[in-house]
C-alpha cells in the first residue's frame, strides 16, 4: 500500500444522548392561612333513659324445676333432656315467657353437670348426692312450717271472743235497771198470792184422800197378767198363771157362805 493512500474515513461518533432531563421542581404553593373554626355550641346533656325494671320471673329457678322433674319422674337411669323439657312445660309453661326456652334449658343442664349438681348417664341426667341430701332435708322443714302455722290461727280466735265480750258488756249495763224493775213488779204480783188462806186448799186434799180408794179396780190386773205370758215362749214365764187361782179364793168363800145360808 502506498503512503498516499488515504486513511479510512472513520464515521463520526454518535453524539452522546442528551442526559435525562431533571424533573422540574414545583414551585411551592402559597397556602392560605387557616381560618379559626367557630367554637361548637355545647351539646345539651341528654336526659338519661329510664331503664325498665326487669320483670321478676314467676317460675322458680331452673335448678329447682329440673330437680322437681327428676324426682317426680323417678326414672331408674335418669331423665333425658326431652323428658325434662316436657315436664317443665306442662307444669310451669304458663310462667315461662322465654322464647328460647329449649336452648336455655340445655345450656343450664350442661352448667349443672359441670358444677356437680347433676350427673350425666348415657344422655340422661340424675341428681347428685349433694342435691339428694338437700331434698331430703327440705321436706321435714315444710312439715314443721305447716305445724307452726296452725297454732297461730287458734291463737287468733280468742282475740275475737274477747272483742265480742267487750262489745256485749255495755249492753248488759244498760239492761240491768230494766230487769230490776221487772223483778219489783213480779214481787208485787207474787205477794197477793201469798195472802190467800191456806184453809181453802185443805178440802181439796180431803177430796184427794177420798179418791184414793181406786185400788178396788185391781181385780182387772189378772187379765193383763194373763195376756203377757202369751208373748213369752219360755216355760219359766208361765208361772204367773197361778196367781189368778189364788185371787179366785174369795169367790169360793162367797159360794160356801151362800151354801151355809
From Swiss-Prot:
Record localization: Nucleus; Chromosome
Q: Specify residue ranges for compositional bias: Low complexity.
A: 1-22
InterPro entries per record: H1/H5, Histone_H1/H5_H15, WH-like_DNA-bd_sf, WH_DNA-bd_sf
The entry's DNA-binding region: 139-142
List compositional bias (Basic residues) regions by residue number. Answer: 133-142, 227-250
Transmembrane feature ranges: none
Pfam families for this protein: Linker_histone
- Identify the stretch(es) annotated as Disordered: 1-63, 125-261
Every copy of the H15 domain together lies at 58-129
Assigned protein family: Belongs to the histone H1/H5 family.
Protein name stated in the entry: Histone H1-I
Top-level taxonomy: Eukaryota, Viridiplantae, Chlorophyta, core chlorophytes, Chlorophyceae
Encoded by which gene? H1-I
